[in-house]
Curated annotation (Swiss-Prot):
Subcellular location: Cell membrane; Endosome membrane; Lysosome membrane
UniProt-listed Gene3D superfamilies: MHC class I-like antigen recognition-like (3.30.500.10)
Gene of this entry: CD1B
Protein name: T-cell surface glycoprotein CD1b
Organism field: Oryctolagus cuniculus
TM region positions: none
Major site of localization recorded for this protein: membrane
Origin: domain of life: Eukaryota
Length: 109
C-alpha cells in the first residue's frame, strides 16, 4: 500500500540514486508475529520491508507504527497515516478476538 507513494516520490526527484528506482519491480513485505502468552495477554509485532530494507515497525505497547526512515511515510498525509494505523489496530484486535474465540478448535491452551 505504501509502495506506490514511495515510487512516485522517487519519480518526482530524478537524479542521483533515484534514477533506477522505477526500472524494475520492487517488493514491499509486511511481517507479523503475534504471541499469545496466556488467555489475557497478547503481543503483536510487525515490520514493513522495502526489498531488504526495514522501513516500519509496529509498537505493540502503544499500538502505533514507527517509521524508521524519514521518507518512509511516502506522500501520505498525517491524516492518511492515522487512518492506516487505525486500520492495523482494528485488524490486530479482530485477529486476537477471532483466535481466542476458536482456541479450542486449534487445540491451544
Amino acid at each position: 500500500m505504501l509502495l506506490l507513494p514511495l515510487l512516485l516520490l522517487a519519480g518526482r526527484f530524478p537524479g542521483g540514486d533515484n534514477e533506477d528506482a522505477l526500472q524494475g519491480p520492487t517488493s514491499y513485505h509486511v511481517m507479523q508475529i503475534s504471541s499469545f502468552t496466556n488467555s489475557t495477554w497478547t503481543e503483536n509485532r510487525g515490520s514493513g520491508w522495502l526489498e531488504d530494507l526495514q522501513i516500519h515497525r509496529w509498537d505493540s505497547e502503544t499500538g502505533t507504527a514507527i517509521f524508521l526512515k524519514p521518507w518512509s511515510k511516502g506522500n501520505l498525509s498525517d491524516e492518511e497515516i492515522t487512518e492506516l494505523v487505525e486500520l492495523f489496530r482494528v485488524y490486530f484486535f479482530g485477529l486476537v478476538r477471532e483466535l481466542r474465540d476458536h482456541v479450542t478448535e486449534f487445540q491451544m491452551k
